[in-house]
């Protein structure tokens, strides 16, 4: 009897493998906000222009999403979409990485260029996509942007650039750095002919892109919270041996120090751009605002 009391009884339960305990949730159906960590349905986030419904954080948009949110329906005509990078320096693994990004993004390069209308006003646009090689600027990216500027110059319409880039593409070395001068020179020629340049810096805009065409707009705008700068925060702090402000290199910091004209919420971007374009079409006449 005592033996029965102190003997261990086998528990009656079924063991469930860890893998079967997981819920089968399709990849991409949910998105976590990088700021407040709230988990949202991706389709609802996309409907809200990829702005967090809880904290207002602006998540990254790809080029196609941005074009759809800004240009009038059916007005966008893409050009130079078949241009693709090669491997001039024979950098190991570069071609394989390019192909992987092409398959992932359905793009041939890190920038989409074309022409269309915003609230009825024509413009040539270039939209960078950070999901392709982190939006880095190589020879083809620089060439596509330069050709877009020349197209705007030829058709005498404004040029709008949306930047999202980690900087120059290291796999192309000096050829990549040359694009800084080429794009800047093209903008200079366009500006000398009274061409309107609008630069919209989105997260992130860094390195050689921030140090060239991204900062050369007649209007320099940015999205809230965008990281904008040349060198990284840690490198700067180690160089100057000082601690930088918490909001250093954010869009709001740059606006406060006179390096931006405005920080524009994504929901207001189309209206803001449309207003700027219409103002320049009317020679500064603001009567259209009353209509």
Curated annotation (Swiss-Prot):
It catalyses: N(6)-carboxybiotinyl-L-lysyl-[protein] + acetyl-CoA = N(6)-biotinyl-L-lysyl-[protein] + malonyl-CoA. Its EC number is 2.1.3.15. Keywords: ATP-binding, Cytoplasm, Fatty acid biosynthesis, Fatty acid metabolism, Lipid biosynthesis, Lipid metabolism, Metal-binding, Nucleotide-binding, Transferase, Zinc, Zinc-finger. One of its GO terms (biological process) is malonyl-CoA biosynthetic process. PROSITE patterns: COA_CT_NTER. It is found in: Cytoplasm. GO terms for cellular component: acetyl-CoA carboxylase complex. Its main location: cytoplasm. Its cofactor is Zn(2+). A zinc finger (C4-type) spans 33-55. It comes from the Bacteria. It is an enzyme of class 2 (transferase). One of its GO terms (molecular function) is carboxyl- or carbamoyltransferase activity. Zn(2+) binds at residues 33, 36, 52, 55. Residues 29-291 form the CoA carboxyltransferase N-terminal domain. Binds 1 zinc ion per subunit. Pathway: Lipid metabolism; malonyl-CoA biosynthesis; malonyl-CoA from acetyl-CoA: step 1/1. Component of the acetyl coenzyme A carboxylase (ACC) complex. Biotin carboxylase (BC) catalyzes the carboxylation of biotin on its carrier protein (BCCP) and then the CO(2) group is transferred by the transcarboxylase to acetyl-CoA to form malonyl-CoA. Belongs to the AccD/PCCB family. Acetyl-CoA carboxylase is a heterohexamer composed of biotin carboxyl carrier protein (AccB), biotin carboxylase (AccC) and two subunits each of ACCase subunit alpha (AccA) and ACCase subunit beta (AccD). This is Acetyl-coenzyme A carboxylase carboxyl transferase subunit beta. It comes from Bacillus licheniformis (strain ATCC 14580 / DSM 13 / JCM 2505 / CCUG 7422 / NBRC 12200 / NCIMB 9375 / NCTC 10341 / NRRL NRS-1264 / Gibson 46). The gene is accD.
